[in-house]
Amino acid sequence: MINESTVLSKNPEMPSRKYLKSIIIEPGITLNEMASDIYNHIDGKVSIHDICSKIVNEYDVDYQTCLEDCMELFELLIDHEAIKVKQGA
């Protein structure tokens, strides 16, 4: 279960590469431009709240909508083991 204070980290065993304005996470996960920007903010140090605050400043979106969209994306990426909940955070 994740919440706004959860800190996430990328799974180093799942390589990713930039393609145009998207990111492709192997094997076969393609993120659109906004999802790519969200993914790029995952660094194992900042919370979901901090990521959403940054995205709100970059895009024309309110915080609650951003949070809901981020949570959905993070759950999907966790299910595909592309990201992990940072232990001890």
Curated annotation (Swiss-Prot):
Domain of life (superkingdom): Bacteria
Pfam families xrefs: PqqD (PF05402)
Protein name in UniProt: Uncharacterized protein YxbA
Species per Swiss-Prot/TrEMBL record: Bacillus subtilis (strain 168)
